Amino acid sequence: MTIRTNTLKTRRRDLAQALINRGVNLEPIGKWTNVGLQVFESSVPIGATPEYLSGHYMLQAASSFLPVIALSPQPHERVLDMASAPGGKTTHIAALLQNTGIIFANDANKARTKSLTANVHRLGCKNVVVCSYDGREFPKVMGGFDRVLLDAPCSGTGVISKDSSVKVNKVMLLVWSSFCLC
């Protein structure tokens, strides 16, 4: 399991030490990120620590850091996250923007915006507007953006990591890969 440090509230080394003190066996993820921690085992529920509840980190796959790193948002920019729930990438963008600028966190599925809103608040993101539009409507609804993130859940990689039967079923793997818009 991996977690992403919320730099709006803490530093990775401080978070790591706090979790180690609670009985969590972890280490920083490689040189390509300064916010990721790999959790190997824990004597406490990682999604219920005081640090988690106060928004010091997000449970998030390390691969989900990459779209935001590639986007490279800069402070004071106007950013659209097209498929934002549950908010891992949106809150990562907010941290990189240092809570400046504005992020339009969109999810076409209105029901999913509940978890998105909860995470935005928990992590202390003050520059996020949560919305639920069909992406084709944005040109009609609001002006341009400095950056747009569309990490569409199309490749099935999340499903593959959670369902081992997909790994051995070539037909299912081909079905999932055919959905990729990349």
Give the residues covered by each predicted segment.
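S-adenosylmethionine
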Residues: M1-C182
